[in-house]
């Protein structure tokens, strides 16, 4: 768990405020990119404090925008800050910060979904997975449009120990829509419990540390924003391939209001569906009438372990997708209807 560190006394020289930079460069948040600017440095400082002690740390900031959190990170006396920004309009403002902190800020124009951060920092920063987290941190005020796909991507990286996690158990402090933040940290049985809850918590210690009211952002989003801290676990709570866990969890939660057996049935082809689902539940010792939100990580571990054995017995099972089966069936029905219509005309 990250310590709540104090910001360093190392300060940037006097600079225009973020609001002044936005006016100077005539910046406007792009709605299509789900951009919302956080201008209150008290709040950006708080985000950085909650990331832990960043003195002499190497930080990767995603989506810096006009540079509000960027300033707070630089004021924490980091060794180096790498920012990756997709929108070229923000580069001049970030360059202004780089000039004010020589040798501290590295700016990359790129997409966080494809950027290879595993090559960004020195090999000397790498630590064994079993050690304390490395002196590498990820911090970001994520655009809502990319927050969920990005955290899923990083969770898979944690599972494989690649991407940003080649350095070890790299900690992350990120913003999400409040509803998503609550789902990520939701306990078993809560109404917010979801696919994201299980996928994040089987791999990480997840904490929803505080909420920022939407009115603190420009433009004001329709929702509040939650700040979430992730520390990868030394040992994942489910020791199966990420894609297998993801498939089981997705199938269970696609019918979140039904009993869990309803979603689990979709793991199997129709011809063997009832028999295989019954076997899965019996071997995993799961009550079929539990709702998805009532299933603990231990329940999912049992389900994934048994499903893995069933996939080993039938190598084609893992590739099965019930939606593809529905498409094929629909296509056959349409062909039959066309044949029937043609025969009727004849």
Swiss-Prot record:
Major enzyme class: transferase
Chain segment of the transit peptide: 1-27
Tissue expression as described in the entry: Ubiquitously expressed.
Chain residues that bind S-adenosyl-L-methionine: 38, 63, 85-86, 111-112, 141
UniProt keyword annotations, A-Z: DNA-binding, Methyltransferase, Mitochondrion, RNA-binding, rRNA processing, S-adenosyl-L-methionine, Transcription, Transcription regulation, Transferase, Transit peptide
Protein's GO biological process: rRNA methylation; rRNA modification; transcription initiation at mitochondrial promoter
Its EC number(s): 2.1.1.-
Upregulation: By the nuclear respiratory factors NRF1 and NRF2/GABPB2 and PGC-1 coactivators.
Effect of substituting residue 141 to A: Does not affect SAM-binding, DNA-binding nor transcription activator function
Consequence recorded when altering residue 111 to A: Inhibits rRNA (adenine-N6,N6-)-dimethyltransferase activity
Subcellular location: Mitochondrion
Catalytic activity from the UniProt record: adenosine(N)/adenosine(N+1) in rRNA + 4 S-adenosyl-L-methionine = N(6)-dimethyladenosine(N)/N(6)-dimethyladenosine(N+1) in rRNA + 4 S-adenosyl-L-homocysteine + 4 H(+)
Molecular function as annotated in GO: DNA binding; mitochondrial transcription factor activity; RNA binding; rRNA (adenine-N6,N6-)-dimethyltransferase activity; S-adenosyl-L-methionine binding
SUPFAM superfamilies named in the record: S-adenosyl-L-methionine-dependent methyltransferases
HAMAP family in alphabetical order: 16SrRNA_methyltr_A (MF_00607)
Subunit structure: Interacts with mitochondrial RNA polymerase POLRMT. Interacts with TFAM. Bound to the maturing mtSSU until the late stages of assembly.
Other observations noted: It has been proposed that variations in TFB1M may influence the clinical expression of aminoglycoside-induced deafness caused by the A1555G mutation in the mitochondrial 12S rRNA. However, this was later questioned as patients with the A1555G mutation had similar 12S rRNA methylation levels to controls.
Family: Belongs to the class I-like SAM-binding methyltransferase superfamily. rRNA adenine N(6)-methyltransferase family. KsgA subfamily.
Role noted for this protein: Mitochondrial methyltransferase which uses S-adenosyl methionine to dimethylate two highly conserved adjacent adenosine residues (A1583 and A1584) within the loop of helix 45 at the 3-prime end of 12S rRNA, thereby regulating the assembly or stability of the small subunit of the mitochondrial ribosome. Also required for basal transcription of mitochondrial DNA, probably via its interaction with POLRMT and TFAM. Stimulates transcription independently of the methyltransferase activity.
Name of the protein described by the UniProt record: Dimethyladenosine transferase 1, mitochondrial
Gene field: TFB1M
